[in-house]
Amino acid sequence: MNVSNHQSTRAKVLIAKTSLDGHWRGVSLVARALRDAGFEVILGGMLRPSQIAQVARDEDVDLIGLNVGGRIEVVYRIMDELRAVGLDDTPVFCGGTVPPGAAAKLRDMGVEVYPPGTTLAAIAEAAGRLTAER
């Protein structure tokens, strides 16, 4: 994989799954691409919304990436949990199966959406932009 290093300092990214759909390939590929691009990646695995917020706070992450597996309502709960622990300014992106109408709602909330087919290079580039803006 040829993903250039977008980071001058190692930004920290939490990658987590939000559903029990059993598909790990995309999560693993995104985590690897971000590592290859110079990010420190915390692979959280399958976590509840409160756990995602706790890990993000405890690890002082710069960015949160979520595999939503079609369950968009869980992203709303995660955003609420992030606000509750004072991380409402931490950028969030999600991927996986996201219905078009839900993608627009997520974007309105400030969540970046990367549907299936988005290149790993595009995700790494966006992660670099999102962490540089902080």
Q: Model segments located where?
A:
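ATP-dependent carboxylate/acyl-activation modules
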Residues: 2-42, 132-134
